[in-house]
C-alpha cells in the first residue's frame, strides 16, 4: 500500500466538495432502487471525519462441534469490549470437520456460501480450528493466525497506524413488509492509495441459541445445548466478494452502494447487523471495516 501525502487545505476543500451533499447519487449496483421506498427508508448523508480512527476486522472460523472454539469466541469478545469500538468481529462457521451438521446432537448448519468461499480462498479450516484472520493481512505464506495471537496483531495495527485510510458509513433498515435488510454503505478515502479497491457487506446475527461442544466446562459429553452464538455470519449483502469501487483512489473521493437481502424466517431482525468493509483486491487486505444495526 502506498500513501501519498495531501496538502491540508486541499484536503479540506475536497472534503467540502465531496461530502456536503445529503443525497445518495444514482445509480446503485445490484439493486433496483425504485423498489425501495426512500420516504420510509431514506438515504443518509455522509460527512468524512479527518480524525476517523482505524478499525480492525477479526474473522473467527468456528464450528459447533469444535470444543475449543468457544474459548476463541471469548477472546474475540474480550478484544471487542476492550477496544472501544475499534474491533469488529465476524464468526464464520465453515468446513466439514467442525461445522457440518452432526445429528441428532448438533443438527444445525450455520455454514454459508460466502463463508465457504472465504474458507476456500484462504485455506483456514484445512489448517484447523479455531483460527482467524485479522484484516486479512498475510504473514509469511498464510493469512490465518491462532486466537492467542489476535491481540498482538490488533494492538500493532491500532498503535502503529491509529488513523484510518478510509471511512465506512452504514445506514441499515429492516423492511418488514418485504422481510429484507436494506443497507446504504459509503466508503470515503482519507488518504490517496495505490491499488484496486472493493466494498463488501455481510449480514450478521447475534444471540443465536443452539448446540455447541465446549471442552472443560463440566458439561455432560461436553455438550452445551443452549450456547449463544454471536457475530454469526448469515450471508453476503453485497455480491460474494463485493463490488469494485476505485482504482488508485484519491483522498476525498467517496463511493456509495445500496444493497438488499431477504432474511430467512429463522433470522431475528432485532439481532441482525450489517458489517461492511473496503479492501484491496490485489492482496485482500481490509483497509477499514464498519458495522451498524438496522433501524426496525
What annotation goes with each model-predicted range?
Residues 1-5, 12, 16-53:
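Bacterial Sec-dependent N-terminal signal peptides
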Residues 23, 68-71, 134:
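Disulfide-rich extracellular modules and peptides
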Residues 8-9, 269:
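Generic alpha-helix initiation/capping and coil-helix boundary signal
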Residues 45-97:
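Local sequence-structure signature of Cys/Sec-based thiol-disulfide redox active-site neighborhoods
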Residues 91, 98-296:
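Short, conserved sequence motifs used for protein processing/export or organelle targeting and
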Residues 13, 50-53, 58, 124, ...:
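Generic detector of ordered secondary-structure context
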Amino acid at each position: 500500500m502506498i500513501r501519498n501525502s495531501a496538502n491540508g487545505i486541499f484536503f479540506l476543500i475536497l472534503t467540502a466538495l465531496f461530502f456536503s451533499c445529503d443525497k445518495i447519487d444514482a445509480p446503485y449496483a445490484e439493486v433496483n432502487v425504485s423498489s425501495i421506498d426512500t420516504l420510509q427508508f431514506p438515504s443518509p448523508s455522509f460527512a468524512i471525519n479527518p480524525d476517523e480512527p482505524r478499525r480492525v476486522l477479526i474473522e473467527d472460523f468456528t464450528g459447533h462441534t469444535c470444543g475449543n472454539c468457544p474459548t476463541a469466541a471469548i477472546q474475540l469478545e474480550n478484544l471487542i469490549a476492550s477496544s472501544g469500538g475499534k474491533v469488529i468481529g465476524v464468526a464464520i462457521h465453515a468446513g466439514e470437520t467442525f461445522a457440518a451438521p452432526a445429528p441428532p446432537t448438533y443438527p444445525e448448519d450455520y455454514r454459508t456460501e460466502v463463508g465457504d468461499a472465504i474458507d476456500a480462498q484462504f485455506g483456514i479450516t484445512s489448517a484447523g480450528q479455531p483460527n482467524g484472520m485479522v484484516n486479512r493481512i498475510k504473514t509469511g505464506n498464510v493469512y490465518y493466525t491462532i486466537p492467542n495471537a489476535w491481540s498482538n496483531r490488533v494492538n500493532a495495527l491500532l498503535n502503529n497506524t491509529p488513523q484510518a485510510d478510509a471511512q465506512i458509513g452504514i445506514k441499515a433498515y429492516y423492511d418488514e413488509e418485504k422481510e429484507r435488510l436494506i443497507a446504504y454503505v459509503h466508503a470515503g478515502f482519507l488518504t490517496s492509495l495505490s491499488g484496486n479497491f472493493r466494498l463488501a457487506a455481510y449480514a450478521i446475527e447475534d444471540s443465536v441459541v443452539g448446540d455447541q461442544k465446549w471442552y472443560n466446562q463440566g458439561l455432560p459429553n461436553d455438550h452445551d445445548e443452549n450456547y449463544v452464538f454471536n457475530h454469526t455470519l448469515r450471508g453476503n449483502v453485497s455480491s460474494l466478494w463485493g463490488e469494485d469501487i476505485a482504482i488508485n483512489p484519491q483522498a476525498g473521493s467517496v463511493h456509495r452502494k445500496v444493497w438488499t437481502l431477504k432474511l430467512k424466517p429463522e433470522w431475528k431482525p432485532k439481532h441482525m447487523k450489517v458489517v461492511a468493509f473496503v479492501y484491496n483486491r490485489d492482496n485482500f487486505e481490509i483497509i477499514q471495516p464498519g458495522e451498524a444495526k438496522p433501524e426496525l
